[in-house]
Amino acid sequence: MGRRRSHERRDLPPNLYIRNNGYYCYRDPRTGKEFGLGRDRRIAITEAIQANIELFSGHKHKPLTARINSDNSVTLHSWLDRYEKILASRGIKQKTLINYMSKIKAIRRGLPDAPLEDITTKEIAAMLNGYIDEGKAASAKLIRSTLSDAFREAIAEGHITTNHVAATRAAKSEVRRSRLTADEYLKIYQAAESSPCWLRLAMELAVVTGQRVGDLCEMKWSDIVDGYLYVEQSKTGVKIAIPTALHIDALGISMKETLDKCKEILGGETIIASTRREPLSSGTVSRYFMRARKASGLSFEGDPPTFHELRSLSARLYEKQISDKFAQHLLGHKSDTMASQYRDDRGREWDKIEIK
């Protein structure tokens, strides 16, 4: 039978002890470490009870007064429901919206459904660091950006006053994909001789227009009007009109000549078409490019370049040939002045690119 506690110790909560000199100590049951609480019995008992609740509950304890005051607070998950509607109202592309939803799903998994004001920077950092520790710094960066935007919207609607995401570190995601040089392009182009004829033409069009592979596959002959190729970029919604008089001197590519070859050889409704004159998917184009790259015998440091790197090559060549401003304009990257113009036009006007 265990030893009976003395009268002084009898009514003390678990883990609270009183020394012979009347000094109270709390012993952490997990480590055995003791913490002094002074000689005031009432304060010592209150502190010990609170510590026991927090240690044994398995989660952060919230005082009753705080719970009463937060009954009308918006929780994180309910706010994310609202945030999804805000995103839908922005008129963004379906693919971009799907990307947002995947990040929101990750946030729901990684953070508790607590009131927004109770989500701490420490909790957010722990979630993001989990991705970084798994080598997913790029994912951490995108999730952080989405969560920060959600918090900014919550501030705008008056639910919180502070964006706790802002205090976290932005993950540094290293781009491991190798850049493609003009000489390497020519070697891959040569290796593509045994590929379907449309691959070389797609490579030429990608470099001379600077557009993404998905937009290349969507280009139609009806998009060419009065010497301009009209492109609405699927990723950003940017509308640009590219002059067909463009040419890349370093590679000897003329946009007009490439278009003429596409018309004569492919003859489909889309500018880039299969041997059956049918539209091609971006996956098919990228896959055949990868085969030609392997056939070229080239080796690269880091991840080998994909078809998308032709866009970067285009920008670098035009930067040398014309100007950095022209290259960024062609890619659809908006300067502050251009962004202002887009807002004024409300997306109704096409941005004509001029060769200067």
Curated annotation (Swiss-Prot):
Disulphide-bridged cysteine pairs: none
MF annotations from Gene Ontology: DNA binding; hydrolase activity; integrase activity; transferase activity
InterPro entries in the cross-refs: CB (IPR044068), DNA-bd_dom_sf (IPR016177), DNA_brk_join_enz (IPR011010), Integrase-like_cat_sf (IPR013762), Integrase_catalytic (IPR002104), Integrase_lambda-typ_DNA-bd_N (IPR015094), Integrase_recombinase_N (IPR010998), Integrase_SAM-like_N (IPR004107)
PROSITE patterns the UniProt entry points to: CB (PS51900), TYR_RECOMBINASE (PS51898)
Key words of the record: DNA integration, DNA recombination, DNA-binding, Hydrolase, Transferase, Viral genome excision, Viral genome integration, Virus entry into host cell
Active site (record annotation): R212, K235, H308, R311, H333, Y342
Biological processes per GO annotation: DNA integration; DNA recombination; establishment of integrated proviral latency; provirus excision; symbiont entry into host cell; viral genome integration into host DNA
EC id: 2.7.7.-, 3.1.-.-
Keyword Iron tagged: no
Core-binding (CB) domain: residues covered: 74-155
Domain Tyr recombinase as annotated: residue spans: 175-355
Physiological role: Integrase is necessary for integration of the phage into the host genome by site-specific recombination. In conjunction with excisionase, integrase is also necessary for excision of the prophage from the host genome.
Protein family (similarity comment): Belongs to the 'phage' integrase family.
The protein's assembly and partners: Homotetramer. Interacts (via N-terminus) with the excisionase (via C-terminus). Part of the excision complex made of the integrase tetramer, IHF, Fis and Xis.
PANTHER family: PROPHAGE INTEGRASE, PROPHAGE INTEGRASE INTS-RELATED
Protein name, entry field: Integrase
Organism: Escherichia phage lambda
Taxon lineage: Viruses, Duplodnaviria, Heunggongvirae, Uroviricota, Caudoviricetes
